[in-house]
């Protein structure tokens, strides 16, 4: 909890800014016991007097009064400015320019209150490239840079303007980073050490009643659109299939699910194979957050180490493949699980709920929340090495 700010300072994020006057002490005329004018023993350093008049003492008294009055005036204005109902200090609106909207040539409507909907005021998103010279930050999504569908306006870049590299893909599916040495100042990604950290989801405190757990009629499900035998998830599925009933959906299986069908379908399953397409640092996607937790199925996680998942969810909210020595051992554990043990995986639902963070507008609005705290002089000289680590 931040240290309370005393009346002699103004609170700013992460620091205290002193007002332009020294620390106040009690005036000398309050703290000093005055000597009488007709003292019979003035002492060797007594002030010269004329008929009981002490000029130096009188000046000191007036100086103390003036200092005290100055302090009271400044303190009054400080209290008046911070009183309830007083006019707030206006904050300038930040403009975040999205150079190319992710995965589309048609950006969504971006009204002025877009970021207000996500709890961030004084923040404006725009896809209008004519604002390049005045934007407070410019965001470049990597996929369009990778395919050269979008090019960097290096010759038009205003001096000192922060540029943001954005990507929610894994390093295995991110190429061409060597072309961007010494260009970007900040990174927006799912990595926890990113300048703008935007996970695919998170758990938040539950504000209403707990929703009932959907009835289960099937064992395990998996939605896969891009099946490649060389991937670890494909190999693990091949090893599990002889021991575990897995219903496979998605384009790769010829059984695609419509957007409105996805969660109701997966809710009927006890387990969901939340297998990431590649295993990288902090790479936990909608497969875990949406297809499993939000649908009401227990995630069977293949991705980063268990400790990474436990940074986001309780340790008893999921099954991790690393906890088992073989696919067969994992399958036996899932099939033989009794009802009491199974329901224990949902204990978190009594106090928490899933918040999905898949909207790019919300992700970009997060830049404004982080903006005051990010170093302007920072540059990623070797973005590829950082992201591939």
Curated annotation (Swiss-Prot):
Membrane topology qualifier: Single-pass type II membrane protein
GO cellular component, one term: Golgi cisterna membrane
Catalytic activities: an N-acetyl-alpha-neuraminyl-(2->3)-beta-D-galactosyl-(1->4)-N-acetyl-beta-D-glucosaminyl derivative + GDP-beta-L-fucose = an alpha-Neu5Ac-(2->3)-beta-D-Gal-(1->4)-[alpha-L-Fuc-(1->3)]-beta-D-GlcNAc derivative + GDP + H(+); an alpha-Neu5Ac-(2->3)-beta-D-Gal-(1->4)-beta-D-GlcNAc6S derivative + GDP-beta-L-fucose = an alpha-Neu5Ac-(2->3)-beta-D-Gal-(1->4)-[alpha-L-Fuc-(1->3)]-beta-D-GlcNAc6S derivative + GDP + H(+); a neolactoside IV(3)-alpha-NeuAc-nLc4Cer + GDP-beta-L-fucose = a neolactoside IV(3)-alpha-NeuNAc,III(3)-alpha-Fuc-nLc4Cer + GDP + H(+); a neolactoside VI(3)-alpha-NeuNAc-nLc6Cer + GDP-beta-L-fucose = a neolactoside VI(3)-alpha-NeuAc,V(3)-alphaFuc-nLc6Cer + GDP + H(+)
Membrane topology, Cytoplasmic segments: 1-55
EC number assigned by the record: 2.4.1.-
Tissues and organs where the protein is expressed, per its UniProt entry: Highly expressed in lung and bone marrow and to a much lesser extent in spleen, salivary gland and skeletal muscle.
Lumenal side: 79-389
Residues bearing attached sugar chains per UniProt: 128, 338
Transmembrane helix is among the record's keywords: yes
Disulfide links within the chain: 115-123, 258-261, 365-368
Ranges that cross the membrane: 56-78
InterPro entries: Glyco_tran_10_C, Glyco_tran_10_N, Glyco_trans_10, GT10-like_C_sf
Modification(s) after translation: N-glycosylated.
Function per UniProt: Catalyzes the transfer of L-fucose, from a guanosine diphosphate-beta-L-fucose, to the N-acetyl glucosamine (GlcNAc) of a distal alpha2,3 sialylated lactosamine unit of a glycoprotein or a glycolipid-linked sialopolylactosamines chain through an alpha-1,3 glycosidic linkage and participates in the final fucosylation step in the biosynthesis of the sialyl Lewis X (sLe(x)), a carbohydrate involved in cell and matrix adhesion during leukocyte trafficking and fertilization.
Family of this protein: Belongs to the glycosyltransferase 10 family.
Name of the protein in its database record: Alpha-(1,3)-fucosyltransferase 7
UniProt gene name: Fut7
């Amino acid at each position: 909890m931040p240290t309370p700010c005393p009346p002699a300072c103004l609170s700013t994020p992460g620091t205290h800014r002193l007002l332009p006057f020294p620390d106040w002490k009690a005036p000398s005329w309050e703290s000093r016991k005055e000597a009488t004018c007709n003292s019979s023993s003035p002492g060797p350093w007594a002030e010269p007097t004329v008929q009981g008049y002490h000029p130096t003492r009188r000046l000191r008294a007036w100086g103390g009064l003036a200092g005290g009055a100055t302090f009271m005036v400044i303190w009054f204005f400080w209290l008046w400015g911070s009183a309830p109902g007083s006019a707030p200090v206006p904050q300038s609106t930040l403009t975040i320019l999205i150079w190319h909207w992710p995965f589309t040539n048609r950006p969504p409507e971006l009204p002025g209150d877009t970021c207000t909907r996500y709890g961030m005021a004084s923040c404006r998103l725009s896809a209008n490239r004519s604002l390049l010279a005045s934007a407070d930050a410019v965001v470049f999504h990597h996929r369009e840079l990778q395919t050269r569908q979008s090019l960097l306006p290096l010759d038009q870049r205003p001096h000192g303007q922060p540029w943001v590299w954005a990507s929610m893909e894994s390093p295995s599916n991110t190429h061409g980073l060597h072309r961007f040495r010494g260009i970007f100042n900040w990174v927006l990604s799912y990595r926890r050490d990113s300048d703008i950290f935007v996970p695919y989801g998170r758990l938040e405190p539950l504000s209403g009643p707990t929703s009932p757990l959907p009835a289960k009629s099937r064992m395990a499900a998996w939605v896969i659109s891009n099946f490649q035998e060389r991937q670890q998830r494909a190999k693990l599925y091949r090893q599990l299939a002889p021991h575990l009933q897995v219903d496979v959906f998605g384009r790769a299986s010829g059984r695609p699910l419509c957007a409105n069908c996805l969660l109701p379908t997966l809710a009927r399953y006890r387990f969901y194979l939340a297998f990431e397409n590649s295993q990288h640092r902090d790479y936990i996607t909608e497969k875990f957050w949406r297809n499993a937790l939000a649908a009401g199925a227990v995630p069977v996680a293949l991705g980063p180490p268990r400790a990474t998942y436990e940074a986001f969810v309780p340790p008893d909210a999921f099954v991790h493949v690393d906890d088992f020595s073989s696919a067969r051992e994992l399958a036996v554990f899932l099939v033989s699980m009794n009802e009491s043990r199974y329901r224990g995986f949902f204990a978190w639902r009594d106090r928490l709920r899933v918040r999905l963070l898949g909207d790019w507008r919300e992700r970009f609005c997060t830049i404004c929340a982080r903006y005051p705290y990010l170093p302007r002089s920072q540059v990623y000289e070797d973005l590829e090495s950082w992201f591939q680590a």
